[in-house]
Amino acid sequence: MKIGSPSSPILSVVSSSGSLDPKISGSLGSRILPATQRSSPSENLLLHRKMSSNSLRHVESMSQLPSGAGKISQLNAVVLGESLASEENDLVFPSKEFSGQALVSSPQQYMEMHKRSMDDPAAFWSDIASEFYWKQKWGDQVFSENLDVRKGPISIEWFKGGITNICYNCLDKNVEAGLGDKTAIHWEGNELGVDASLTYSELLQRVCQLANYLKDNGVKKGDAVVIYLPMLMELPIAMLACARIGAVHSVVFAGFSADSLAQRIVDCKPNVILTCNAVKRGPKTINLKAIVDAALDQSSKDGVSVGICLTYDNSLATTRENTKWQNGRDVWWQDVISQYPTSCEVEWVDAEDPLFLLYTSGSTGKPKGVLHTTGGYMIYTATTFKYAFDYKSTDVYWCTADCGWITGHSYVTYGPMLNGATVVVFEGAPNYPDPGRCWDIVDKYKVSIFYTAPTLVRSLMRDDDKFVTRHSRKSLRVLGSVGEPINPSAWRWFFNVVGDSRCPISDTWWQTETGGFMITPLPGAWPQKPGSATFPFFGVQPVIVDEKGNEIEGECSGYLCVKGSWPGAFRTLFGDHERYETTYFKPFAGYYFSGDGCSRDKDGYYWLTGRVDDVINVSGHRIGTAEVESALVLHPQCAEAAVVGIEHEVKGQGIYAFVTLLEGVPYSEELRKSLVLMVRNQIGAFAAPDRIHWAPGLPKTRSGKIMRRILRKIASRQLEELGDTSTLADPSVVDQLIALADV
């Protein structure tokens, strides 16, 4: 299916001059600002302050944080029961040596750059964009935007009219600059001793061969190509090959079930899917081709037939003989790709032409096809990577994320390669064959920048520190965290044990929808507070609003929104622009609503507090509660289900499911396992409930609405905080649920 530019004639555009008026505020107290008033966050940051106390504030709930607009009960503290770092003795300063060599070496330099990006975003981003290759430069108008549904359809455009290609800028440009012999990818297999590498010249040749195959089989500019691959080198190769010919790649995490994959195939209607026969992750072998076969059978029943299934023969995991095959549709990758030329003409595209679709969980249960375009995304990922990690040409960079998620798109593939970086790609599990595998890889490739998720940090914390300290790790100079708020104790372990108390941590906040980092420390610029994402990136104006959409200034808690557009912003939800507007721009008119809660302390540091909608963040993966509920009720013995998130010491959040069975069906451990298996099969193992709580009934209002607030309290055992239950149609249900809490 051809995917057109989101900037179609039906979307009217409200133009912006590209100028933002900064407002200087000297007030530290929380006060409400008019929703239409623009202000520069950098003007509100304090460089110096007097310490009133050396003690740490101990926060048990968000209600203990001050807010001029009243407390917002739906929000949770960063990690309940942990100290929020806010006092002088909990500030972590970069070393003088690090700051001296950093791209942004002081608070003053950061503030000057951020102020310029706010005062004149058109000039700021044009200067950066000019460092990349454009076949044709954009026109006089650098960007146009309308983020206010009251003024017309939501629309964002950056560098429209500019003609470029992101694959060319990732590969050809670097080869032409003399980096052809530089290692582009170090690939580390699941098993010890299994590895490979590609230089930028070799990577370009491999990309061109696959691109030529796709073109030869009818894939054209705007066509969707689904990629269901593990972390083989072929995954970034496939992404870049699609980008080279203007095709729109849709990478599906190779842990999603056949049903989830089929949903995505039906939505974007590709004629080609790329996969492999199997993969080994740790000691387990996963038959990916069987999952793809089942998905293609299902999508065919739903009216979408895929013509070609190009399958990589991963001989380390299985054999061809053990791979089910459908002649006429299935093609072995190695049998055909090597026959194609190693050069391929670039398809030049407009900056606003689609680059990729990436499906993310929504609160309604139907996955959302987030659509990113080419030019703005290219500039934003390259720039955020460069500054947030203080990237130098000698760095070796490793991000542990899978390319099935946005982090793998922006910070395994595009962002690093646009900077000519050497990237480590790891196929296996971080604790296989033992919990020291990560640090073995760090030493092997002399990794200097290591970017991972708090879930992995917390998991490795549980093992003896010797698994870390027996490795040198002297090459490390910058650490990074992504996917969810990192709790202060995990931050400190990461800093002290992994980084030997010398590596700054870029604790990044961003989303699939934002394309790149939005709030992040810049190593060398600011002292850090464990658990805080620190300050906004260039061109980003975060605001915290109350339930009525009023901006709150100073120390406060509330809903995190963004004022104004930025180059990396997604442009629409594929095929559903109305849902795009309803989900992200209608809750608070005039702003992009992140769906996250946030607090800001008296120094201006931002603290992300988790989702405020019906989405659970499990190990950095966003999972809609409605998706899990829909999977549970497919079980023949399940009458109804309600899912909430709970704290999990490793995953950040876990999935807690209240299940009502059909009349007369008894509770049993076998049934519990069967329900969990149903979710695994429907969505994937990562969405499996951590707890099934038997529920004779669910707490509902008289209008039939489930009171999830009460379910969250029961799940977290906060029984003294249930609040008013008198509005429930049957208040006795609550007592029944409490009685069954340990069954």
From Swiss-Prot:
Catalytic activity, reaction form: acetate + ATP + CoA = acetyl-CoA + AMP + diphosphate
Entry-linked Gene3D superfamilies: 3.30.300.30, N-terminal domain of ligase-like
GO molecular function, one term: ATP binding
GO biological process, one term: acetate metabolic process
Root EC class: ligase
Gene Ontology annotations for the cellular component aspect, listed alphabetically: chloroplast; chloroplast stroma; cytosol; glyoxysome; plastid
UniProt subcellular location: Plastid, Chloroplast; Glyoxysome
Alphabetized PROSITE patterns for the sequence: AMP_BINDING
Active site feature: 613
Enzyme Commission no: 6.2.1.1
First-listed, main subcellular location of the protein, grouped into a coarse class: plastid
Range of the transit peptide: 1-84
Keyword tags: ATP-binding, Chloroplast, Fatty acid metabolism, Glyoxysome, Ligase, Lipid metabolism, Nucleotide-binding, Peroxisome, Plastid, Transit peptide
Entry annotated with the keyword Plastid: yes
Tissue specificity comment: Expressed in leaves, flower buds and young flowers.
Keyword Nucleotide-binding (UniProt): yes
Task of the protein: Catalyzes the production of acetyl-CoA, an activated form of acetate that can be used for lipid synthesis or for energy generation. May play a limited role in the biosynthesis of lipids.
Protein family according to the UniProt entry: Belongs to the ATP-dependent AMP-binding enzyme family.
Full protein name: Acetyl-coenzyme A synthetase, chloroplastic/glyoxysomal
Species annotation: Arabidopsis thaliana
